[in-house]
A protein has these predicted regions:
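An N-terminal hydrophobic leader/cap segment in hydrolases
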Residues: 12-65
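Membrane-embedded segments
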Residues: 62-149
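Short alpha-helix in the alpha/beta-hydrolase fold that links the catalytic acid
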Residues: 105-106, 224, 233, 247-257
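Hydrolase active-site cap/lid region
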Residues: 173-227, 277
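Short beta-strand/loop motif that positions the catalytic acidic residue
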Residues: 231-232, 236-243
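Acidic catalytic loop of the alpha/beta-hydrolase fold
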Residues: 242-246, 273-275
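C-terminal catalytic histidine-bearing segment of alpha/beta-hydrolase fold enzymes
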Residues: 253, 261-295
Length: 295
């Protein structure tokens, strides 16, 4: 009877494999981006703070080659696109949910680091999210990130003025790029990880409370805890201590501990997965980011 139960559970888990992969890439499609006019759920409620004028908001897109076909990935650049060859630019890689409208509030926050317009900020939707074409997969996410970096380099950005910021799922492309600099058009001078996950395997084991390889449940190969060992640029790690989605102790702490060289941490009591900037206080949050970028 015991062996029959094990076989039944195994077959049930295999049937969920596609669903679990989809859960980690939980994007939603749109007919159009609304940004400030979006009425759906958002990552943070800014309540009118940190406004960005229309003159600094630029819808952009860039080509990504996926399986031999060229698709278009959509992005939003906040800043003066004519000054990318002079400005320091933050490439923001968002989390696993919905699309850029959900994370637009965060891009506005980052556009106010050091004062409005001090830094350019580029955010983009991964393939399969929002209006970005293609299918949501790990490799396609990396390909889109590479194209975003090339878009910035083509406009004059250099390594010393390039900062990457990854939130949640977005920690994967940041660690990938920073750990494999020769494969990308630019190498970030600093990286920021907020609520990163250690690996797909640990994420699944945490969720399922099962001691089995994560590869049994998902196709993802993401392993930030290993990739971070290859990163030799300064790291700022931010994590809410009440994060129940990606536990600080089993995810962020492991990534941080595996990073050698210059690193800083900000651990926020009471901060949950999405709420850490709010709990910390928006102004204190962006001032801490500014201090790291300017150091």
């Amino acid at each position: 009877m015991k062996y029959i139960l094990v076989i039944f559970i195994g077959l049930s888990l295999l049937s969920c494999r596609k669903r679990l992969d989809s859960f980690l890439f939980n994007g939603s499609k749109l007919e159009s981006y609304q940004l400030d006019n979006y009425t759906g759920e958002v990552s943070l409620e800014l309540n009118g703070q940190f406004a960005v004028p229309d003159s600094l908001i630029h819808r952009v897109h860039f080509p990504v080659v996926i399986d031999g076909e060229t698709v278009q990935v959509q992005g939003v650049y906040v800043g003066d696109t004519n000054h990318i060859n002079q400005d320091t630019v933050i490439l923001y890689c968002h989390g696993n949910k919905d699309h850029m409208d959900f994370y637009w509030c965060r891009e506005k926050l980052y556009a106010n680091i050091g004062g409005l317009g001090r830094y350019g900020v580029l955010m983009f939707d991964y393939p399969g999210f929002g209006l970005s074409e293609g299918t949501a997969t790990e490799n396609n996410m990396y390909a889109a990130t590479s194209s975003a970096i090339s878009w910035l380099k083509d406009r004059g950005l250099s390594n010393d003025r390039f900062v990457m910021f990854g939130f949640s799922l977005g920690s994967a492309p940041v660690c990938e790029v920073a750990g494999h600099s020769s494969d990308y058009a630019l190498q970030p001078s600093k990286i920021i990880l907020e609520a990163p996950f250690a690996s797909a395997e640990i994420m699944i084991q945490d969720a399922a409370l099962l001691s089995m390889p994560g590869s049994f449940l998902v196709d993802l190969k993401i392993d930030n805890a290993t990739e971070i060992k290859k990163v030799n640029v300064p790291l700022l790690w931010i994590h809410g201590m009440a994060d129940s989605f990606l536990s600080m102790s089993s995810h962020g702490q492991l990534v941080y501990d595996n990073k050698t060289g210059v690193k800083e941490s900000v651990l926020v009591p009471g901060g949950e997965h999405e709420t850490t900037p709010f709990v910390m206080g928006y102004q204190a949050y962006i001032e801490r980011l500014a201090a790291f970028i300017q150091s």
